[in-house]
């Protein structure tokens, strides 16, 4: 038979409400185990994550379970052992995952347990694969480079045709079809 407290402690209720509010503001969550990290290492990790507007919060598993349940999410498998959650917007989740895995290479005590990215549950291996993908800015720049390269090649071909014509060489443009 479970023993129940006679009354709820206001400090604990406030802590759960604060955590619920923070979880509600974020769209993605990356769960980590921080056992063995020093205060200096946690501070350095938080500083690196701040670049991505990420809040890295050490949570009590019971409080986090209550908060996630109130948000209609079940994450019990990630709330085992000392848990810290990186709260981040989906736009920056890739960069945060990359920072966490890079930090885990330097400090093996940090373990990424899994994530919920925009409502989809990822295990640790999927989060690691996700962290290796290029971010949104990199993808946009790669796309624009490809567009620019095609345009530059087209302009160079046109310029070569103009140069040949100026030299007096007759230029004929042949289509890819049959010329017979």
Curated annotation (Swiss-Prot):
Give a GO molecular function annotation for the protein: structural constituent of ribosome
Family to which this protein belongs: Belongs to the universal ribosomal protein uL10 family.
- Signal sequence extent: none
Q: What is this protein called?
A: Large ribosomal subunit protein uL10
Which species? Treponema pallidum (strain Nichols)
What does the subunit comment say?
A: Part of the ribosomal stalk of the 50S ribosomal subunit. The N-terminus interacts with L11 and the large rRNA to form the base of the stalk. The C-terminus forms an elongated spine to which L12 dimers bind in a sequential fashion forming a multimeric L10(L12)X complex.
- InterPro entries reported for this sequence: Ribosomal_uL10, Ribosomal_uL10-like_sf, Ribosomal_uL10_bac, Ribosomal_uL10_bac_type, Ribosomal_uL10_CS_bac
Name of the coding gene: rplJ
* Biological processes annotated in GO: translation
| Pfam families reported in the protein's UniProt record | Ribosomal_L10
Record keywords:
Ribonucleoprotein, Ribosomal protein, RNA-binding, rRNA-binding
């Amino acid at each position: 038979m479970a023993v129940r407290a006679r009354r709820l402690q206001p400090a604990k209720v406030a802590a759960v409400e604060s955590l619920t509010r923070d979880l509600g503001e974020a769209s993605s969550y990356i769960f980590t185990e921080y056992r063995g990290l020093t205060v200096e290492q946690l501070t350095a990790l938080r500083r690196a994550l701040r670049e991505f507007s990420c809040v890295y919060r050490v949570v009590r598993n019971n409080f986090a379970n209550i908060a996630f349940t109130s948000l209609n999410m079940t994450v019990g498998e990630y709330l085992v052992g000392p848990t810290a959650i990186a709260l981040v917007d989906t736009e920056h989740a890739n960069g945060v995952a990359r920072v966490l895995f890079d930090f885990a290479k330097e400090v093996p005590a940090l373990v990424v347990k899994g994530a919920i990215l925009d409502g989809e549950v990822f295990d640790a291996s999927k989060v690691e694969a996700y962290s290796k993908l290029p971010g949104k800015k990199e993808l946009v720049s790669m796309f624009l480079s490809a567009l620019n390269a095609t345009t530059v090649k087209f302009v160079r071909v046109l310029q070569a045709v103009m140069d040949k014509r100026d030299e007096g060489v007759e230029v004929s443009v042949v289509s890819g079809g049959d010329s017979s």
